[in-house]
From Swiss-Prot:
Probable core component of the endosomal sorting required for transport complex III (ESCRT-III) which is involved in multivesicular bodies (MVBs) formation and sorting of endosomal cargo proteins into MVBs. MVBs contain intraluminal vesicles (ILVs) that are generated by invagination and scission from the limiting membrane of the endosome and mostly are delivered to lysosomes enabling degradation of membrane proteins, such as stimulated growth factor receptors, lysosomal enzymes and lipids. A motif (Type-2 MIT-interacting motif) lies at residues 170-181. It comes from Danio rerio. The keyword DNA-binding does not apply. This is Charged multivesicular body protein 6. Residues 168-185 have a biased composition (Acidic residues). Belongs to the SNF7 family. Keywords: Coiled coil, Endosome, Lipoprotein, Membrane, Myristate, Protein transport, Transport. Residues 187-206 have a biased composition (Basic and acidic residues). Residues 11-103 form a coiled coil. GO terms for biological process: late endosome to vacuole transport via multivesicular body sorting pathway; protein transport; vesicle budding from membrane.
């Protein structure tokens, strides 16, 4: 059971994978910092409004200066986040390119092995042999066609006609060999005479 449901083989983690992971972690930290600074700036802005209402203009001005400095920090943070994301994308795309190159390399090696088995010279040899065989067969056909005389042609046609006629005779039904019995020609006349004599006998009886 342990062998059937064992753990899958762990995927090998490369240096590029570690670099991408670190960059993403740094990006997430900067986003958390960005969010925290934004919330703090909103609170201090509300506090500056309240200080102005209370007539504490100097303190309100100090908070607004601090807010301006934090705006600059947010802008720098945004630039750093963009740089990190761009770096992550570049590394991931480079990994894809490496896989493509590895695939091309495997394909090229396979083609080289195939070319070693079937070189250009071998292909040309096969094509030449095929062409020679076709030409040789043509010559044989021409020799056979030209060697028959007119008498031979007529004999061939006569044999073909005989074969065709023989097949046609086989398809016809056979005529029965026994003779049919003859039908007497005077029978109908005698029958008529019987019919005529019958009424005469009936009249005599009456």
């Amino acid at each position: 059971m342990g062998n059937l449901f064992g753990k899958k083989k762990a995927t090998r983690v490369t240096e590029q994978d570690r670099a991408v992971l670190q960059l993403k972690q740094q990006r997430d930290k900067l986003k958390q910092y960005q969010k925290r600074i934004t919330l703090q700036m909103d609170k201090e802005r509300q506090l500056a409004k309240q200080l102005l209402k209370d007539g504490k203009k100097d303190k309100a001005l100090l908070l607004l200066k601090k807010k301006r400095y934090q705006d600059q920090l947010l802008e720098k943070t945004e630039n750093q986040i963009s740089n990190l994301e761009r770096m992550v994308q570049d590394i991931e795309f480079a990994q894809i390119e490496m896989k493509v190159i590895e695939g091309l390399k495997v394909g090229n090696d396979c083609l080289k092995k195939m070319h070693e088995v079937l070189s250009i010279e071998e292909v040309e040899k096969i094509m030449d042999e095929t062409h020679d065989a076709i030409e040789y067969q043509k010559q044989i056909d021409e020799m056979l066609a030209g060697s028959l005389t007119q008498e031979d042609e007529e004999a061939v046609l006569a044999e073909l006609e005989a074969i065709t006629q023989g097949e046609a005779d086989l398809e016809l039904p056979e005529v029965p060999g026994e003779e049919l019995p003859e039908v007497p020609e005077q029978e109908p006349v005698r029958e008529k005479e019987r019919v005529k004599k019958k009424p005469e006998r009936e009249m005599v009886a009456v």
